[in-house]
Amino acid sequence: MYHLNVTPDKQTSPHGCLVVSETDQQRSHVKERVNGTPNQNGGTSTSSKPRSVFENRPPQRLTREAMSKYLRERNDQTLIILHAKVAQKSYGNEKRFLCPPPCLYLMESGWKQKQQILEEADQAPEAGQVHAFIGIGSSDQEMQQLNLDGKNFCTAKTLYISDTDKRKHFMLCVKMFFGSGLEVGAFNSRRIKVISKPSKKKQSLKNADLCIASGTKVALFNRLRSQTVSTRYLHVENGNFHASSIQWGSFAIHLLDDDESESEEFTVRDGYIHYGQTVKLVCSTTGMALPRLIIRKVDKQTAILNADDPVSQLHKCAFYLKDSERMYLCLSQERIIQFQATPCPKEPNKEMINDGASWTIISTDKAEYTFCDGMGPTSKPVTPVPVVHSLQLNGGGDVAMLEVNGENFSPQLKVWFGEVEADTMYRCEEGLLCVVPDISEFREGWTWVKQSVQVPINLVRHDGIIYPTNLTFTFTPEPGPRPTLARLLYISSTPRDRIMPDRVPGRGVLIRPTWTTT
């Protein structure tokens, strides 16, 4: 019997901070690399391209020993592109930079390990330096170089989309390569919707794609006197909420019942967020949460108490700390404080707030890619990175097939169950089919499943690149040894009404996949 789980098989941690220092000559060179001639592998090529000892390395098929080492050490390379879901269009000569600015994070220890391997192999300290460029996927704008100077993250603060670009949606593209010339690949963000400007009219759910649903991620930023240089973002660092001018946080916004009490555990509601409702903001990275808040519409320097329309993208809003004496979430320089509003003498449905208590809200998204050089550096880019969305188990007993559904699949991919490579058939870019290995592949001498055995599911490319998933496969205990072929033939010739289910050992019950969010 079998069971499928969606479980994280490791904790994400920010390891492998890269030290990158570049001369003007190197900056000029990497710019040539990005603006060079596209090659058939999705990268770029120029005549001045440096040569690496790994450049012409033939593909190395992943071995069981290499997979075993990977499962023990998990030297992954994770790349995260964090960005807003909408972008405001620029008109004429103005440049409305994407806000909050797209962020690139390089996580896990594999980046540091790869850097050391390339530096030692090519005997050059610049060989392991990571170069990254970002663009909006348009030939009208050059890609901008990102500054990974001694950090594992960087931001693109000067990206914009002009009115000459007629696209209604676009994706950011990040191109990366090492100083040795080895390409990491080209990575896309999630889709971003282009809007002209925030709507000042009362919103309705007819424009649901601009509304904000409970449970989705948002960013909050404050811009004093509409000055770009004064922009600060709500962020969590060192266990504290603060207003950062460098990094921004992504927060899950949950809708609560009005009578929900303050607690570390709370019940959330579905639906779109409306002004006047009780919400909870939870940091998507640390899990830290603010107290219960009532979200209120902002008009100039006042919070409207009786507004009840849906919250929309790039609206200005205020967050009243529920059950407090007119206290609002506010910033003061880098600190997050409580600001006490004052009633409007002529308008009882409004309270006066200061600029620091007015926040702009926008939905966010992220694209995350994880991979590992299981057999050492390869000459090909790791992209496109396959992504698994779901698994479907078919059959059972002696023959069980697993359908893998996702995107960016290719005939060069194999499904691995732990240390065991499965017979894999390529269907299309969205589907793979594989044979579930026998339990004896994992437990020597076993002819049936005596106790639960859980193994991770990973995808592996023909040149040893490992693409981990957060999925596991569980072999669940069977009632006894599987029947011999002679026994199966006897059963198949027996009248149906004489077969007792408990007399057919080893066939078990097929347990359909159960999915749990993590």
Swiss-Prot record:
Superkingdom classification of source: Eukaryota
Protein name: Suppressor of hairless homolog
Residue spans of biased composition, Basic and acidic residues class: 24-34
Region (Disordered): 22-59
Pfam families: BTD, LAG1-DNAbind, TIG_SUH
Localization (cell): Nucleus
Species of the source: Halocynthia roretzi
Keywords linked to the UniProt accession: Activator, Developmental protein, DNA-binding, Notch signaling pathway, Nucleus, Repeat, Repressor, Transcription, Transcription regulation
UniProt DNA-binding region: 89-96, 223-232, 296-328
Function in brief: Transcriptional regulator that plays a central role in Notch signaling, a signaling pathway involved in cell-cell communication that regulates a broad spectrum of cell-fate determinations. Acts as a transcriptional repressor when it is not associated with Notch proteins. When associated with some Notch protein, it acts as a transcriptional activator that activates transcription of Notch target genes.
Family of this protein: Belongs to the Su(H) family.
Domain IPT/TIG, residue spans: 386-476
GO cellular component, as recorded: nucleus
Entry annotated with the keyword Transcription regulation: yes
Ranges of compositional bias, category Polar residues: 36-50
Gene it is expressed from: RBP-JK
Assembly and oligomerization: Interacts with activated Notch proteins.
Broad class of the protein's primary localization: nucleus
GO biological process: Notch signaling pathway
Gene Ontology molecular-function annotations: DNA-binding transcription activator activity, RNA polymerase II-specific; RNA polymerase II cis-regulatory region sequence-specific DNA binding
Gene3D superfamilies the UniProt entry points to: 2.80.10.50, Immunoglobulins, LAG1, DNA binding domain
KW Nucleus (keyword) present: yes
